[in-house]
Amino acid sequence: MDKTKRFSVTDPGKNTPIVFDQIFAEKVGGGLVKNSPFDLYPGMAVSADGDVIKAYKVVEDASESASSIKIAKNSGIVKGDVIAKGKVGVACTAVDTTTSKDFDTVTVKLTVAVSKGDILYQAASASADAAAPVHAPKYLLGEFVEANSGDELVKLVNGANIRKETAPVADEVVALMKSIEKI
């Protein structure tokens, strides 16, 4: 044994952001979340049927005439998803996942400006003035779920104060949930 090396250093890893400031209501016994090809994070919106509403975090400002936007990695975005801000939804026509380890470049025809830090949501269909989430939100996911792990029994939150800086859910989706508030 080398006597000069009596210790080792272990990288602490990535910090897990705090999403819930206060939880005051949960679905008794939890509920099933459907199998997902991407990781699911605490605070993501879930329908009554266990379908997750994807959330896309913008990592760089883009004007309303931009042909692409940069979305943080691990959002689950795929070609064909409809990305929405407010009531405007646009279809994703291509996704470049190879350019950066921090973000995906998503090809869209924007008609609304987006800012760094905005959380966009997965809409049911493209629209210039009537976009709505792909599923009606009922709960927030209360725990991490690994990709491709099958249907999972999880904690589902239906009453909480969540942190606006870290919650992976769009304001438009939160507005549809009467007992969830971003603070």
Language-model regions, residue ranges each:
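Surface-exposed, low-hydrophobicity beta-strand/loop segments enriched in small/polar/acidic residues
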Residues: 1-183
